[in-house]
Design a protein with these regions (language model features):
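P-loop NTPase catalytic core of nucleic-acid-dependent motor ATPases
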Residues: 2-131, 135, 140, 169
């Protein structure tokens, strides 16, 4: 019974392996769906916990307050905000995580263009902004991929040919 599996997952007392043991027949038929449901529930709980631990706006740096305020405004079409520092430990990755948890941001790291576009087509629904959180050591080739994807996002239309090919029309987003 799928409702019994859902209930057991929502109770959160059993591991995924224990759920598979207890609901063997259901997992035989719907393993991918039930595993995704379990993982999504775990992620929701993790996000809620992180959101609580990162609540408040005690910014270490003035630019963080400026950025937090900027993403609450209406996005400007084709505007890309670039935040860069030669040194580390100035709060950029922290800010990316904060915006993902509190302001409906999607955070993207360096990866192949096809993977990046696939990720975006799966996660942009309801997003207010897209943040590219790149390390200082990110290779130039990876950065040029980010430029290409930023161009598509700023045009309001992205295409992904990976797996289940799709294209999306987008409202203006904050691009950071």
């Amino acid at each position: 019974d799928l409702l019994a599996v859902q209930s057991a997952i929502n109770e959160g007392e059993l591991s995924l392996d224990e759920l598979r043991e207890k609901f063997f027949n259901e997992f035989c038929k719907f393993d991918k769906f039930l595993t995704n449901y379990f993982v999504n529930r775990q992620q929701r709980l993790q996000r809620d916990s992180l959101r609580l631990s990162m609540s408040g706006s005690n910014w270490r740096f003035p630019w963080q307050a400026d950025l937090a305020n900027a993403v609450m405004l209406t996005p400007q079409p084709r505007r890309i905000s670039w935040w860069w520092e030669a040194q580390g430990n100035v709060g950029k990755s922290y800010m990316a995580r904060y915006l993902a948890l509190h302001c409906d941001a999607v955070v993207v790291t360096a990866m192949k263009k096809a993977d990046m576009l696939h990720l975006l087509t799966k996660t942009l629904s309801g997003a207010r902004c897209v943040i590219f959180d790149l390390t200082r050591t990110t290779e130039d080739g990876s950065v040029s991929v980010v430029y290409e994807v930023l161009e598509q996002l700023s045009n309001g239309f992205i295409c992904s040919g990976k797996y289940d090919s799709t294209s999306l029309f987008l409202q203006p987003l904050h691009l950071i």
